[in-house]
Amino acid sequence: VMEIIGEISADIVAPNAEGVDHEGPKVVDNHVVYAPGTAQNIEVMAKAGLFGLTLPRKYGGLNFPLLYFVMANEMVARADAGFENIWGLQDCAETLNEFASEEQKEKYLTRVCQGETCAMDLTEPDAGSDLQAVMLKAHWDEARGTWLLNGVKRFITNGDGHISLVLAR
């Protein structure tokens, strides 16, 4: 697996890096569309089964120890640090794997393992990244069957990700 990550990083991700930097993502119909090179990187990594590296097999992951994810992440970062920021955020799923209900794990972890990207919503205007100073409030709306958020986030890491890990009180 590490050899495959190295090959994909060297043969696909690295050659795409310069073009991705020049072209960048675009907003189309209020949605972020990755540069073609980034989209190709995601597709190739997903087809190779390299999302969900540390997640349990029952969700489609490889069940690797974190050390292997860190090593793989370094290989991807060497090829393209910008893409590493997208691919590496699969680590958000570790929080779900640790704390989510089984229903939530089935819903979200399988999607990460299939190549859907994650976003990390932590930073706030008056708190920065001081996690204890977070003011965003969350409450469950029984009538709608969903969580409602009240507050402000900024500098969302990979804000266009399919699955967001939001820090709230």
Where are the model-predicted features located?
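Amphipathic, small/basic residue-rich leader segments at the start of a protein or domain
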Residues: 1-83, 103, 107
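Short, flexible loop/turn elements at secondary-structure junctions
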Residues: 49, 59, 124-126, 142, ...
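Flexible loop/turn segments at secondary-structure boundaries
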Residues: 59-63, 92-95, 104, 126-130, ...
